[in-house]
Regions:
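Short, flexible loop/hinge motifs at secondary-structure junctions
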Residues: 1-162, 206, 224, 235, ...
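RNase H-like nuclease fold core
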Residues: 44, 51, 195-204, 208-289, ...
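Mobile genetic element proteins and their domesticated derivatives, centered on retroelements
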Residues: 45, 52, 107-108, 146, ...
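Short helix/loop capping segments that flank catalytic or ligand/cofactor-binding pockets
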Residues: 117-119, 154-157, 242-244, 260-262, ...
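Short, amphipathic alpha-helical "recognition" segments used to contact nucleic acids or chromatin
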Residues: 168-181
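DNA-recognition alpha helix
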Residues: 186-197
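Conserved beta-strand -> loop -> alpha-helix junction used to position metal-binding or nucleic-acid-contacting
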Residues: 287-289, 295-324
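Acidic/histidine-rich catalytic cores and adjacent linkers
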Residues: 290-294, 323-455
């Protein structure tokens, strides 16, 4: 048998191949090897896919993974153009004494100079000077001494920094390029050179940003106190590499303020540092266990995270489970659409919690659903705080939106290369985002902050 080879037998149009024992073993080992290779490739692909499709990543972050479809919208016949009340995009003309008359010189077709002017066309343009160069100022300060207390001091004018070679307006421009335009240091210096004939080294730009961050330290500390005393907070965190190690950016968002802190921990010690042990406000968050530290707070767990988890269930029972949870979420939104009394809210909270308990008790019998039912059960009393208390959102979208800018910065710069860089970023990014939420003029606020603390 050991030396036998395979034989072919023909039955009509079918050919059956009889393999020898050695050939069967050889083929089996080959298939087993291929199977192991395919398994490893599958695991690697699934691991890569989990970076984009997981319960902690919102669908908006992965537009390329969304199915392409055309949404049908029934529109009544109407005139083309902007809807009634639309302000339009045409810029209003401005009064100016600057006039330029362009005269004809020759026919563009035959180059003849024999032509006549039959009319004129009016237009208005806004233009920058061909060369915008920084102004160099030699500054002389009086050194004064008080005749009463004998204190020696330098004269100030609230517009000229006491130290450094760069003025307030230039510092504001550089901060705009870094934090609003998201420019990296090298490209920022290239832009300043091309646009303003201002030659700066990347190190100089970095020093200006650090000086601005130090000027904002007092306001940043004040912002911390506002967040600590806020009655309602939306909190989220995301990873960020610092000197090759995994750190975390925490976002604390209230109705009017945003605080970013960058720490080497994702634990409850960060919550204790920022909010204190006795924080008793309302916190909207995901189910990360660090938030359990806030024992005196009212916690609202994020329904967006939960529904993303349940949507991954592919079995029949899993799909039914997801539909039940989606119906509860829709019920929350419908209930909160109207004004409710405290009594109505407590009654609805009790009813909804009991209903959710019943649902997870039923679906916990299915193996695929167990991870989601446990996820819910660990925080059962925290899923309907938005029903019990008015003005609370059922999702943590506010915090996720607040931290999105930091995620974009992470994609651009990759990592912070110094501990100082984390302090600079968290200070200026927090202040700028807060001014944006409060609809303040960022340029004016930066000028005010820098003038107050540096001049």
């Amino acid at each position: 048998m050991g030396g036998e080879k395979s034989k072919d037998y023909t039955f009509g149009k079918m050919i059956i191949q009889i393999l020898s024992r050695e050939e069967i073993i050889e083929k089996y080992l080959k298939l087993e090897k291929e199977n192991e290779k395919l398994k490893k490739e599958k695991e690697a692909l699934e691991k890569e896919l989990r970076k984009y499709k997981n319960p902690n990543t919102p669908p908006s972050a992965n537009q390329h993974l969304k199915p392409s479809y055309i949404k049908e919208i029934n529109v009544k016949p109407h005139k083309r153009g902007a809807p009634p009340g639309h302000k339009g995009t045409t810029r209003a003309k401005k009064e100016t004494l600057n006039v330029r008359h362009i005269c004809g010189e020759e026919c563009p077709n035959c180059q003849s100079e024999d032509f006549q002017v039959i009319g004129c066309k009016l237009q208005q343009q806004e233009e920058l000077p061909p060369e915008i160069q920084p102004e160099t100022v030699n500054i002389t300060r009086d050194i004064c001494q008080c005749n009463k207390c004998h204190l020696k001091f330098l004269a100030r004018d609230n517009q000229t920094p006491l130290q450094g070679k760069f003025g307030i307006n230039l510092m504001v421009l550089i901060i705009f390029l870094k934090f609003i335009v998201r420019g990296v240091l090298r490209k920022t210096t290239s832009f300043l050179d091309a646009s303003f004939a201002l030659k700066l080294a990347p190190a100089s730009v970095h020093a200006i940003i650090e000086r601005a961050a130090k000027a904002g330290e007092a306001e940043y500390e004040s912002l911390k106190q506002k967040i600590k005393s806020a009655k309602l907070l939306y909190i989220d965190e995301t990873s960020f590499s610092v000197l090759g190690k995994n750190w975390w950016v925490w976002a604390f968002r209230s109705d009017t303020d945003l605080l970013l802190v960058i720490r080497n921990s994702r634990g409850n010690n960060v919550l204790e540092e920022i909010l204190g042990k006795d924080y008793a406000g309302i916190v909207v968050c995901d189910c990360w266990r660090a938030y359990d530290f806030l024992i005196n707070a009212f916690l609202q767990r994020c329904w967006a995270h939960l529904l993303r988890k349940s949507k991954e269930l592919k079995s029949v029972a899993g799909r039914h489970f997801h539909k039940k949870l989606t119906a509860l979420f829709d019920d929350i939104k419908k209930f909160n659409d109207k004004e409710r009394t405290e009594k109505q809210r407590m009654r609805k909270y009790t009813k909804m919690t009991a209903k959710l308990q019943k649902i997870i008790s039923y679906y916990s019998r299915y193996e695929e659903c167990k991870s989601v039912t446990k996820y819910i059960d660990f925080h059962l009393e925290s899923w309907f705080t938005c029903i019990k208390l008015a003005g609370v959102q059922p999702t943590n979208n506010y915090a996720e939106q607040a931290i999105r800018e930091t995620v974009l910065v992470r994609k651009i710069i990759g990592a912070f290369r110094s501990n100082n860089g984390t302090k600079t970023y968290e200070t200026l990014a927090s202040l700028i985002a807060t001014w944006q939420y409060q609809k303040l003029d960022i340029k004016k606020e930066l000028c005010r902050m820098l003038s107050t603390n540096l001049c």
